[in-house]
Amino acid sequence: HGTIDYIDEPAETLEWQRRTGKTIGTQGSNYLMYESIGIFRTQDDLDSYPHLSDARVGDVKFRDVNGDKKIDGDDKVRMDKPAVPEIMYGINLGTTYKNWSLNMLWQGAARVWQYTFMEAGIIGNFTKDFYDNRWTEDNPNAKYPRTYNRDATVTGGGNYRNSFWLNNASYLRLKSIELAYNCPKSWFKGTPISGVR
């Protein structure tokens, strides 16, 4: 991927929100997001740090990028994390021993990110991992923020799209494997068969 050398942007566009200089074809060149810096674990935590007006304990905490002690649209940043893999690769490995052969094809993608939600289908249909590891008063050090209402949420995206839900989607998988045995030619003497594998 190349980078955007120039794009007609308003002069007042904040430096961290510009598309110029970002990688072509990535989320970083297309989307603005709040940068997650954790979860509001307690009321004191919420009261002592700038937050959106509807934020509650258990919500994702966003970075005050410009340091003005408030969280608003000026704090969104362009995330330089591509939705389309920047690196795709394959590895073909093979070995033989006597009449046996083993071949494997590995395939992978790297430097790719996916924006994921912990809710699917009807409202309130959360994944088990999210539900079991969400913030609650009894579990303030949870892995995930509190459960949320899809229509008014700080945690789940919507009007407050944020990097908490941006996950590395790089992978390496075994696409195919073949174990073969080459039957000795002596087995087929006197037949039109030249070999069987």
Question: Which stretches of residues belong to each language-model region?
Answer:
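Extracytoplasmic gating/loop element in the C-terminal half of outer-membrane beta-barrel translocons
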Residues: 29, 54-57, 109-195
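Membrane-spanning beta-strand positions in outer-membrane beta-barrel proteins
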Residues: 101-105, 188, 197
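Transmembrane beta-barrel strand/turn architecture of Gram-negative outer membrane proteins
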Residues: 1-33, 88-124, 177, 181-182
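Generic recognition of flexible, low-complexity loop/linker segments
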Residues: 78-80, 89-92, 185-187
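Conserved small-residue
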Residues: 1-83
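Extended hydrophobic secondary-structure segments that form protein cores and membrane-embedded regions
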Residues: 1, 196-197
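Glycine- and acidic
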Residues: 75-77, 86, 90, 159-166
